[in-house]
């Protein structure tokens, strides 16, 4: 079994700043949409999602209600998550053997309501049920939903991961990754996660004493292979999912 720590949403390079926490709720802002050779890759604006003011504030006025956003991952009212991936990031997931039954934990950069401290936190999950390749065309249902990866191909290996998923409705301490008072990239890691157990994090100087991990500054998908019998990581994962679901 694999746990994928999947970095998503606004940050200082994509969007311009951290996503907000509003009345105790983490609100992950989708990154701005791009156009590709196939045409418009989004039919959704920040205003459509009720995020116009938040996008304007986080981007310092560079974005607003009328700007198109890359609405992905997409969480549905039916309790599903639709997550598109492609290019090198998708190739990495395939090489790591990610598939049905594995879990994505989406995390991003947020700003504390009080004090404004930027930090990383988990804001949602996807338990994979199926992987939908898009090279032969997107299912009509996904096009109708306006999923950006269904509207236009982003790369030759474009696909959508689909399964049960939820967003967290409260910014609880249990979902915070950044060490309190530290730079956003210094993360608290669970006891079961050790050096060699997370893709793109092989360097010894990233694994610090006291259960800390200095995360890489770039990249989207970081995979932890927890095997089929290890109990500690499974218990940790289920506690995270339970916290997300309880807050919803």
Annotate each PLM feature.
Residues 51-119:
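Short N-terminal edge-element motif at the start of the domain
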Residues 115-132:
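Short beta-strand-centered aromatic/proline hotspots
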Residues 5, 103, 123-125:
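Conserved hydrophobic/aromatic beta-strand scaffold that supports enzyme active sites
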Residues 1-50, 131-248:
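Contiguous surface segments at macromolecular interaction interfaces
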């Amino acid at each position: 079994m694999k746990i994928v720590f999947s970095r998503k949403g606004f940050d200082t390079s994509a969007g311009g700043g951290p996503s907000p926490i509003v009345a105790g709720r983490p609100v992950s802002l989708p990154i701005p949409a791009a156009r590709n050779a196939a045409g418009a890759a989004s039919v959704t604006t920040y205003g459509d999602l009720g995020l116009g003011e938040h996008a304007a504030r986080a981007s310092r006025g560079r974005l607003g209600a009328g700007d198109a956003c890359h609405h992905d991952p997409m969480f549905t009212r039916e309790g599903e998550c639709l997550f598109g991936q492609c290019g090198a990031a998708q190739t990495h997931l395939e090489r790591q053997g990610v598939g049905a039954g594995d879990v994505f934990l989406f995390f991003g950069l947020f700003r504390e309501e009080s004090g404004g401290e930027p930090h990383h936190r988990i804001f949602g999950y996807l338990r994979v049920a199926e992987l939908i390749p898009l090279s032969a065309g997107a299912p009509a249902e996904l096009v109708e939903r306006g999923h950006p990866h269904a509207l236009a191909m982003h790369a030759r290996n474009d696909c959508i991961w689909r399964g049960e998923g939820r967003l967290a409705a409260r910014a609880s301490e249990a979902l915070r990754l950044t060490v309190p008072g530290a730079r956003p990239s210094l993360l608290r890691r669970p006891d079961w996660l050790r050096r060699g157990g997370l893709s793109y994090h092989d360097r010894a100087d990233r694994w610090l004493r006291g259960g800390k991990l200095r995360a890489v500054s770039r990249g989207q998908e970081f995979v932890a292979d927890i095997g089929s019998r290890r109990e500690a990581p499974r218990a940790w994962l289920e506690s995270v999912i339970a916290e997300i679901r309880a807050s919803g």
